[in-house]
Regions:
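Conserved beta-strand signature within the Rossmann-like core of class I S-adenosyl-L-methionine
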Residues: 123-133
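Conserved N-terminal segment of class I S-adenosyl-L-methionine
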Residues: 1-99, 110-122, 136, 142-148, ...
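Hydrophobic adenine-recognition pocket in adenosine-nucleotide-binding enzymes
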Residues: 103
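A short His-aromatic
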Residues: 106-107
Length: 258
């Protein structure tokens, strides 16, 4: 298989939606979990980690491919590790929280277990989201139902807690893929100290995690699911380019007029 290279335009676009989404999501989770260390697998430039840092989490590590330009990192260089996410990672340490947000769909299906193994090897608590079928995006080669990932975590003793989606599903500042796909997975050790409201959000054993989304989201998925993958990638690349340029112009505007 030809290796897909993610361009600066891709990461410019990702940064835009990631930062706007990270602030309310982390604003909700941080006081609930109070992590002192966070790992992000598929971190890109580290925008999510920078938002964790702004909440006071000093110990962060982002892991992504060597295609990430380290001159553009949002975190310190020593807080980033270039690695192959299709292989199981052994970082030799544990974190209070590991996360992987909208990454699994970019990896081959055969690497799904490796990703989950890497996350569960690193923490008792994992914040996870990945694109569902029909979501669409650049190089989405592994869109899966949420229950697919649920089964992989269950095989490692991690239970799903659906605490994030009910809180954020109406917050349009958060990109829909984070609003509708984010699940907290926790093993037996990680349950200790969880607040009562998160404990009440545990998905009953034997119950699949339900797909999220409003009518517009479901219609979008229905349409996109019938398009060829290459067409979806091309559409996503054009859209990312337009939105990235728009964001750059908006941020440059005040500076030019000053």
């Amino acid at each position: 298989m030809t290796r897909h290279i993610y361009t600066d335009t891709f990461f410019d676009y990702i940064n835009q939606s990631a930062r706007a989404s990270a602030q309310p999501l982390i604003g909700y989770l941080y006081p609930k979990l109070r992590p002192t260390s966070v790992l992000d697998l598929g971190s890109g430039r580290g925008v999510w980690l920078q938002e964790w840092q702004r909440k006071g989490v000093a110990d962060v590590l982002g892991v992504d491919g060597d295609y990430v330009d380290q001159d553009t990192l949002a975190v310190e260089r020593d807080a980033f590790l270039a690695a192959d996410l299709t292989q199981t990672l052994n970082l030799g340490r544990r974190f209070d929280l590991a996360q992987s947000l909208e990454v699994g769909e970019h990896l081959p299906r055969a690497a799904s277990e490796m990703l989950v193994s890497s996350l569960t090897a690193a923490s008792d608590r994992v914040l996870f989201s990945a694109a569902v079928p029909g979501q669409g995006g650049e190089h989405h080669i592994n869109e899966q139902p949420l229950a697919f990932w649920q089964e992989l975590f269950a095989a490692r003793g991690y239970r799903p807690f659906d605490c994030v989606r009910p809180v954020l599903r109406s917050n349009r500042k958060v990109a829909p893929w984070y609003r509708y796909n984010s699940i907290l997975y926790v093993n037996e050790e990680g349950r200790a100290g969880l607040p009562d409201d998160i404990m009440r959000s545990e998905v009953p054993e034997g119950t699949p995690v339900k797909e999220g989304g409003d009518l517009v989201w479901r219609l979008r998925r229905a349409v996109v699911s019938h398009l060829p993958r290459q067409t979806v990638t091309q559409i996503a690349q054009v859209r990312a380019g337009i939105l990235a340029k728009r964001a750059a112009l908006q941020s440059a505007g005040p500076q030019q007029s000053a």
